[in-house]
């Protein structure tokens, strides 16, 4: 039952995912829209799917592989195109592709999928080529294809929608993709002229994999003598250990040896070193499991003892948009392959488990191990010399029982409401000498998250919208060359180049420190936030604190204020701009905090302050503060200061004679203070209204606070047209016309309701009296009376069919006037006699029913 634990964890995750998602919400501190920061773009009209990126650090050139084209652009400014070459599909191939049921407009094209360095003067390029994958060599000098047209089967996918990955190792291409047209035969292969290898076509080896990443880890100088280089493949596949009604996906890491040459008799031209293990990325305390692998990045840095794998995961049932980042050390991965237990296929009754741990003897040399000095000492100099027993064991047991666990046994980052697609990681040194890992993670909506791994937390520094449209980022590339650090992102529409930091966007020392960006520091000398490692000046005196402590920011700049004049009874809007998503905006007036619950105040966008019904008591100084909590400490900084003065505007009645002589311009000047409700200046001559200037400074207080006045540009114009504020007396005719129209409409509706009878009973009597004189109105029970008459007449009709005479209907008491004249009034005795003469079959069905069945005749019994 131990093997069912991962599955139980997955099902538990599916149950608690909605409950636990709320807790995983690290919000980016800053959000940059597409036009707010300096981004460089490259796009060629008519070309799409920029999914292959390759950097040449020596030449400062970025190679871009797109649909039917390859470009070379300047790595420092990708908008500068250097070279281009097109690789289009012939019409004949397009027609043959369309005959196979594929789209001629979208699928039967040449999508560049492999773009790898072959030598210093050439690139190895492969494309889907209308479902006929083809590879060629691209000469970098002439930037033209050499026309080799090699078969790309097993190196490049047939379908552009199928997964793929590749890496060039020593001039040999290692790739993971599909091997046939349908994509039903997955393969991990090595393209070599002297020793090509591939995986066994068997479900235990690869079961519907989705390839994500591949890279080579060279042997360590401190490792055992004679150790071989290893190539790692990362993918997600359908589980072979468990079987359910749905396909359970499992993330894997597989390893092959560079020196593998296949077996002599068993596993000929097949990998003899292929082993795979499960990757664990889960939160133990919540049971949340992330089992869909999206991307992997290998972090290599001089300060690291060994490479670290950073991987992006999402849950299989990701209906709430959860993503996670887990990190794995190379030693942990190698320990599973070199010392871990194997699994074997078994049938367990009444269980979903299909594979269990193998506890039997393991052959020597160890199956799946690379040829090292120990194997050579035992005369196993090559995989061709390995015994069949070892090779058969590898063929039957490619899956490891032990799993690869992440660092600290938990994800580095869990983020909700986002789907991460790609990741790159940079290791940088802060001002205090500490090294930090900074992750750049792209989303399926074209955004880039930047997060730094601190001692006890992961801080999401910022979110940058790379593309105007919310399109997924297909690939990420990091250039960490000293003095030139950029992130390149490719999507379906183009490529975007972004710097690793936007330090210049932080306008104050507090804001620069609170960003907790290891790339940024505050320079008191130039009073600006600068980028580390890119400034030639000395860093002496720079301020940076990764804990967010702003106590070192002693250089307080002079505080400026905005002065406003408003009329009594109006509404004032005081603006405050705060960029941090982690900060809370607080408004203070006379050392007291203003609350939105008060009917006196309101907030626009949780930042700007609205003051209603201004009075003399509202005059004073209003301060907008930003309170941001960092590591159980609240950091407060002043964002804006407003000096508000409320004045009573005297109303002088205009002279009747002078009012007629006034021009439209004089009216505006005299009524300007009344019309100004959003922050106009006090009443001044008309010349001042046309030439606004800075407000007069108030006298300095005894507290000694240095405040520098700031010119106020009102949010509304100083001059308003009178007709936009008041309704002229000459326009009363418009109001009277409107009222008259409403009255006529009311009369029409009333007349229509009277005609249709859609009125209460009293009104109907009044209507009848007016229209019909003394005629008695029709009773409200006329419908009921008619129903009674029809009920009493119907039996007579049936009796007439049987040859009997029809019986007269009962007297209802509502005969017409002519009927009462031509007939006499019946007595009580006659009425009772007529009722007794009614036969049983003439009575209503619901009075007396002796029928056995509803559709039978009464006389048929």
Curated annotation (Swiss-Prot):
Extracellular side: 24-733
Membrane topology designation: Single-pass type I membrane protein
Domain Sema: start-end pairs: 24-500
Chain ranges on the Cytoplasmic side, renumbered to this chain: 755-861
PROSITE patterns to which the protein is assigned, alphabetical: IG_LIKE (PS50835), SEMA (PS51004)
Keyword list, A-Z: Cell membrane, Developmental protein, Differentiation, Disulfide bond, Glycoprotein, Immunoglobulin domain, Membrane, Neurogenesis, Phosphoprotein, Signal, Transmembrane, Transmembrane helix
A matching Pfam family: PSI
GO cellular component: centrosome; ciliary basal body; extracellular space; GABA-ergic synapse; membrane; nucleoplasm; postsynaptic membrane; semaphorin receptor complex
Matching InterPro entries: Ig-like_dom, Ig-like_dom_sf, Ig-like_fold, Ig_sub2, Immunoglobulin_dom, Plexin_repeat, PSI, Semap_dom
Protein name per Swiss-Prot or TrEMBL: Semaphorin-4D
Organism: Mus musculus
């Amino acid at each position: 039952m131990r093997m069912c634990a991962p599955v139980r964890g997955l099902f538990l995750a599916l149950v608690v995912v909605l409950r636990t998602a709320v807790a995983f919400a690290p919000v980016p501190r800053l959000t940059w829209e597409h036009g707010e920061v300096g981004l460089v773009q490259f796009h060629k009209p008519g070309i799409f799917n920029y999914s292959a990126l390759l950097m040449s650090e020596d030449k400062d050139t970025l190679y871009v592989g797109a649909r039917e084209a390859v470009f070379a652009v300047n790595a420092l400014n990708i908008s500068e195109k250097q070279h281009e070459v097109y690789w289009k599909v012939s019409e004949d191939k397009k027609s043959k592709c369309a005959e196979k049921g594929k789209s001629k407009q979208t699928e039967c094209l040449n999508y560049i999928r492999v773009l790898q360095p072959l030598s210093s003067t050439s690139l190895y390029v492969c494309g889907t080529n209308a479902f006929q994958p083809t590879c060629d060599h691209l000469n970098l000098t002439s930037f033209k294809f050499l026309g080799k047209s090699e078969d790309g089967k097993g190196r490049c996918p047939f379908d552009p929608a199928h997964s793929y990955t590749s890496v060039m190792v020593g001039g040999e291409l290692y790739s993971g993709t599909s091997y046939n047209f349908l994509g039903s035969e997955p393969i991990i292969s090595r393209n070599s002229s002297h020793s090509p290898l591939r995986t066994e076509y068997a479900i235990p080896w690869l079961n519907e994999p989705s390839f994500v990443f591949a890279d080579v880890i060279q042997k360590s100088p401190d490792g055992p003598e004679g150790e071989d280089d290893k190539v790692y493949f990362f993918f997600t596949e359908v589980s072979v250990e468990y079987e359910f009604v749905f396909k359970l996906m499992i993330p894997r890491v597989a390893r092959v040896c560079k020196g593998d040459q296949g077996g002599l008799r068993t596993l000929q031209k097949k990998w003899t070193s292929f082993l795979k293990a499960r990757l664990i990325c889960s939160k133990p305390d919540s049971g949340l499991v992330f089992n869909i692998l999206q991307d992997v990045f290998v972090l290599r840095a001089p300060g690291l003892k060994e490479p670290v794998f950073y991987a992006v995961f999402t849950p299989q049932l990701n209906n709430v948009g959860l993503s996670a980042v887990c990190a794995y050390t190379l030693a942990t991965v190698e320990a599973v392959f070199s010392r871990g237990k194997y699994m074997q296929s078994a049938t367990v009754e009444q269980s979903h488990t299909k594979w269990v741990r193998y506890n039997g003897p393991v052959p020597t040399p160890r199956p799946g191990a690379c040829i090292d000095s120990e194997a050579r000492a035992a005369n196993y100099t090559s995989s061709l010399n390995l015994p069949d027993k070892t090779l058969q064991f590898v063929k039957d047991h490619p899956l490891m029982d032990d799993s690869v666990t992440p660092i600290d046994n938990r994800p580095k980052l869990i983020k909700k409401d986002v789907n991460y697609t790609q990741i790159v990681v940079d290791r940088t040194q802060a001002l205090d000498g500490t090294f930090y890992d900074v992750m750049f993670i792209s989303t399926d909506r074209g955004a880039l998250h930047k997060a730094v791994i601190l001692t006890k937390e992961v801080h999401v520094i910022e979110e940058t919208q790379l593309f105007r449209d919310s399109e997924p980022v297909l690939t990420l590339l990091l250039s960490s060359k000293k003095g030139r650090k950029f992130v390149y992102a490719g999507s379906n529409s183009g490529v975007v180049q972004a710097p690793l930091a936007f330090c210049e966007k932080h306008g104050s020392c507090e804001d620069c420190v609170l960003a907790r960006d290891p790339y940024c520091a505050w320079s008191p000398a130039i009073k600006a936030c600068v980028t580390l490692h890119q400034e030639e000046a000395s860093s002496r005196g720079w301020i940076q604190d990764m804990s967010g402590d702003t106590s070192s920011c002693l250089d307080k700049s002079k505080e400026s204020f905005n002065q406003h004049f408003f009329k009594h009874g109006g509404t004032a809007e005081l603006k405050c701009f705060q960029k941090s998503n982690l900060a809370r905006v607080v408004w203070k007036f006379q050392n007291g905090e203003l609350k939105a619950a008060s009917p006196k105040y309101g907030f626009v966008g949780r930042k700007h302050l609205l003051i209603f019904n201004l009075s003399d008591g509202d005059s004073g100084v209003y301060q907008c503060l930003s309170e941001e909590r960092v590591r159980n400490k609240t950091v407060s900084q002043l964002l804006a200061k407003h000096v508000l003065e409320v004045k009573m505007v005297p109303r002088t009645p205009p002279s009747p004679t002078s009012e007629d002589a006034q021009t439209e311009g004089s009216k505006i000047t005299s009524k300007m203070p009344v019309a100004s409700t959003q922050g106009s200046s006090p009443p001044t001559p008309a010349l001042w209204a046309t030439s606004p200037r800075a407000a007069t400074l108030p006298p300095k207080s005894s507290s000694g606070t240095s405040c520098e006045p700031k010119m106020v540009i009102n949010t509304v114009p100083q001059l308003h047209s009178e007709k936009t504020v008041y309704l002229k007396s000459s326009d009363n005719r418009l109001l009277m016309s409107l009222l008259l129209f409403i009255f006529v409409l009311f009369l029409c509706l009333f007349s229509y309701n009277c005609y249709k009878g859609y009125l209460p009973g009293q009104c109907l009597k009044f209507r009848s009296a007016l229209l019909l004189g003394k005629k008695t109105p029709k009773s409200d029970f006329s419908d009921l009376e008619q129903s009674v008459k029809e009920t009493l007449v119907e039996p007579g009709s049936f009796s007439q069919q049987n040859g009997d005479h029809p019986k007269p209907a009962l007297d209802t008491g509502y005969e017409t006037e002519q009927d009462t004249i031509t007939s006499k009034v019946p007595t009580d005795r006659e009425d009772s006699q007529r009722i007794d003469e009614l036969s049983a079959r003439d009575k209503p069905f619901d009075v007396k029913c002796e029928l056995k069945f509803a559709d039978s005749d009464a006389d048929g019994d």
